[in-house]
Every structure is written in structure tokens, then in C-alpha cells.
């Protein structure tokens, strides 16, 4: 059995025929791996996984009056769904490997089977549609979908993934149809490029269709970044985003992290701006989007972290189009932080605690946001309001393969000028294999 040694970007994995070892360098995971000269051996030594998940959601929101069946994120709703996820990725055949995954969901219960759901403004709900409360998070005609599936090339310095991939950056947090390139041929540097045609969700708690990120231009959305490490403590990152006819953006982020034994302390500062175009927010007539965020944190590796920070958005259109593919800036979980996502001139102060031991992990975020509603073109500025928000997550493993999860969101405080107060509870049970 002929084998070759390559560098790969993965963590520790072990099966009967091979071992993959990894080390962490400059925030990315790099390691040695066996690459096979035979396609058959690469496929035989791949790894498959799956899960069966029961997941439910209840929102204590506003009740519809009369025969009105239209609902939004603030409406009272409840549902229970079951889903099955399957995934496989091969070992490397020389410089190549493949990955494929699927998820299918079925509705077990809906509090209101006749409710009608629309997209609204929140970009976490792209082109939402459907009937019944489960359509809040699981679009009616998109309940059996291809998940993360791609072809990957890796030669030691360059990684290229093409297909349906998970994009993760300051302004991306979801699956996209596109190409992701990463290169580390320059000393102490990481160069990344991401091209996106469509984006969407295929998760146990959310399944949407995949929609064109730029219906006005066939070029799609492109992100490019350059990150440079200064010694072992500091790094600086510059990036740009182009989505022709909609917006262009640029940003810079500086970070510092010091480690001693198993403990660490760090801070980061980040600024970004969007330049809105003809089909951007307010058709580019109300200025540009802005983001400023600062974060400090301290923690113990693989056990606990405490962090706090500030986030501010632009005074006219908030983040503008920066959040087109989501973000990793907001400390709130995927269903929270609406005032920051949709409001303008937002000022968020927050604290966050994360803890994990054995099979139990939890996270809690508390934040207070002062913000205004977005004004239309030539409309006077709207008044400020404030909303306080707590997000809580508890993930506990009963056994190695059987686990449960609880998520809670609650908003309170302020005058409810733009959003009513609400409580949202998610419950899930997962059998992994």
C-alpha cells in the first residue's frame, strides 16, 4: 500500500488503518497525514457519521387577532421536528478528497398548522416562506437538502474547497455554494479568498433554501483577506468584500493573545465599512454601513472563558450590507441580537461566559443595546430605544452518543418602541453515530 505524507488542515483522528496527527499553529490547525496513491484505499479509509435529532421550538410572542394567519419572528408559535443527518468524507487521494452530507426533516407537531410565514427583514431568514409553525425555521419545500459537500485540493501550502462549504469569517457564518482558497506559502501569513454564488442553512435547527447572494450581477460575492502574525502574540488582518451593484466593503482587525500554561488572555479590535451601491441598503442614498467592535477575554483552555466587549454600528443604516452572509461579530446566538442586526446607530455592551467539563457545556450572554429604527430616504431620524437580552445554552451528554440541548432567549427593558419583548425556548435530543 503506497502512501505519501502531506500537510493537512484537520484535527486529531484515528481509525484502524491510519492516524492523523495535528498541531495548532497561529490559530489554524495543521498536521501530518497519510495520503493514498489509490482511489479505492482513499474511499475505504474515509469517515462516515450521522445523527437522529428531535428538536422543538416555542416562542412566547404576540398572538394573532381574528382570522389573521400571517406570522413573524415575534409571533407566538411552537413546533417539534425530527431530522436525520448523514455525512461522509474520504481520506486524501494524493492531493484530493471529497465530502458529502445530507439532512432530511419531518414535522411531528405544530401549534398552528395554518400559520403563514414570510421573510421579513432579518437576513437570517432569506426568502422564508411556508405554512405551519415549523416553517418559521424549516422552509416548507426545503426539508430534504444537500448539506456540506465539496471537493478539496491540498498540496501542503494551498487548500481549495469547491462546492457547498461552511464559510467562517468576520462576515460569514453559514453554508455557501462557492469556492474557498487558503494559502500559507508566505512566512507568518495566511491569504484567503472566498467566492460565493448562493447561501443558506442546512442544520438540525434551521433549513432554508439556497438563494443567490447577488441577483443583480452574475459575478456573485467575493471576499479576500491577508492575515499576518507578528511574533507569537499579535496578528493583524486586512480584508475586502465585493458584491457588484450591491455593495463593496473593507475592514481591518488587530488581535493579541498571550498564553501561559493552560491559561490565556487576549483582546481584539475590529473596524469595517460598507459602500452601498444601487441595489444596496436604501439604494445607496443614505450613506454607508459601519462596524466597530472591541473584545477582551480570559480563559482556561478546554474549560472556561469569560469575555466582554462593545459593538457599534453606523448612524444611518447600521451595518448596511455587511451582514449579507451573516457574521461572527455578534456575541448573541443565531436567533438573537436583532436590535444589532436590524437597528441603526446601535451601541451594544455585553458580557459572555462559557464553561465545559466532561460531557456538559454551557454559555450565557447578557447584553444591552441602545439603537434606533432605520429611517427611510429623506425621513427624519427615529428616536432611540433600548433592549436588554439574555441568551443561555446548555449542552449535556447522557452518554458518548446521546445528548440533549436547551437554548433560551429573553428580551426585556426599554419601551418596546420597535420590537415587543419575547421569550424563545429551544429543546433538542440527539443520537449520534
Question: Where do the model's predicted regions map?
Answer:
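Surface-exposed coil loops of outer-membrane beta-barrel proteins
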Residues: 116-150, 154-244, 322-344, 348
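Active-site-proximal beta-strand/loop segments in catalytic clefts of secreted hydrolases
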Residues: 103-104, 165, 311
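Positively charged n-region of N-terminal signal peptides that target proteins for export
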Residues: 2-4, 13-19
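Sec-dependent N-terminal signal peptides
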Residues: 19-27
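Aromatic (phenylalanine/tyrosine) cluster motif
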Residues: 6, 10-12, 32
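Beta-barrel outer-membrane channel/assembly domains of diderm bacteria
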Residues: 27-160, 182-183, 259-261, 354-365, ...
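Outer-membrane beta-barrel pore domains
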Residues: 62-75, 240-244, 249-433
Amino acid at each position: 500500500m503506497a502512501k505519501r505524507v502531506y500537510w493537512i488542515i484537520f484535527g486529531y483522528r484515528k481509525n484502524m488503518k491510519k492516524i492523523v496527527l495535528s498541531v495548532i499553529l497561529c490559530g489554524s490547525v495543521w498536521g501530518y497525514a497519510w495520503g493514498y496513491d489509490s482511489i479505492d484505499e482513499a474511499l475505504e479509509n474515509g469517515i462516515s457519521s450521522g445523527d437522529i435529532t428531535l428538536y422543538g421550538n416555542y416562542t412566547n410572542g404576540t398572538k394573532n387577532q381574528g382570522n389573521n394567519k400571517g406570522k413573524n419572528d415575534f409571533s407566538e408559535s411552537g413546533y417539534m421536528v425530527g431530522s436525520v443527518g448523514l455525512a461522509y468524507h474520504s481520506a486524501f487521494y494524493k492531493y484530493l478528497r471529497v465530502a458529502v452530507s445530507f439532512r432530511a426533516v419531518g414535522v411531528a407537531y405544530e401549534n398552528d398548522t395554518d400559520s403563514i410565514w414570510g421573510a421579513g427583514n432579518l437576513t437570517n431568514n432569506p426568502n422564508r416562506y411556508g405554512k405551519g409553525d415549523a416553517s418559521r425555521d424549516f422552509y416548507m419545500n426545503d426539508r430534504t437538502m444537500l448539506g456540506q459537500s465539496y471537493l478539496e485540493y491540498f498540496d501542503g501550502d494551498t487548500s481549495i474547497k469547491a462546492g457547498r462549504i461552511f464559510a467562517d469569517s468576520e462576515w460569514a457564518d453559514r453554508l455557501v455554494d462557492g469556492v474557498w482558497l487558503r494559502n500559507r506559502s508566505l512566512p507568518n501569513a495566511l491569504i484567503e479568498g472566498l467566492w460565493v454564488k448562493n447561501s443558506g442553512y442546512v442544520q438540525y435547527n434551521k433549513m432554508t433554501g439556497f438563494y443567490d447572494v447577488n441577483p443583480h450581477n452574475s459575478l456573485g460575492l467575493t471576499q479576500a483577506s491577508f492575515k499576518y502574525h507578528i511574533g507569537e502574540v499579535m496578528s493583524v488582518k486586512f480584508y475586502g468584500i465585493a458584491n457588484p451593484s450591491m455593495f463593496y466593503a473593507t475592514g481591518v482587525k488587530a488581535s493579541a493573545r498571550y498564553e501561559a500554561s493552560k491559561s490565556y488572555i487576549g483582546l481584539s479590535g475590529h473596524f469595517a465599512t460598507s459602500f452601498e451601491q444601487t441595489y444596496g441598503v436604501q439604494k445607496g442614498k443614505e450613506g454607508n454601513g459601519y462596524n466597530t467592535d472591541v473584545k477582551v477575554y480570559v480563559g482556561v483552555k478546554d474549560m472556561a472563558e469569560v469575555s466582554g466587549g462593545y459593538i457599534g454600528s453606523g448612524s444611518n443604516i447600521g451595518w448596511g450590507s455587511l451582514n449579507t452572509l451573516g457574521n461572527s461579530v455578534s456575541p448573541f446566538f443565531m436567533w438573537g441580537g436583532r436590535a444589532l442586526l436590524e437597528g441603526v446607530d446601535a451601541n451594544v455592551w455585553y458580557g459572555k461566559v462559557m464553561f465545559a467539563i466532561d460531557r456538559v457545556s454551557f454559555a450565557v450572554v447578557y447584553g444591552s443595546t441602545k439603537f434606533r429604527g432605520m429611517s427611510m430616504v429623506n425621513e427624519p431620524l427615529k428616536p432611540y430605544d433600548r433592549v436588554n437580552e439574555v441568551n443561555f445554552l446548555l449542552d449535556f451528554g447522557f452518554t458518548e452518543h446521546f445528548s440533549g440541548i436547551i437554548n433560551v432567549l429573553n428580551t426585556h427593558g426599554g419601551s418596546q418602541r420597535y420590537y415587543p419583548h419575547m421569550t424563545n425556548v429551544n429543546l433538542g435530543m440527539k443520537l449520534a453515530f
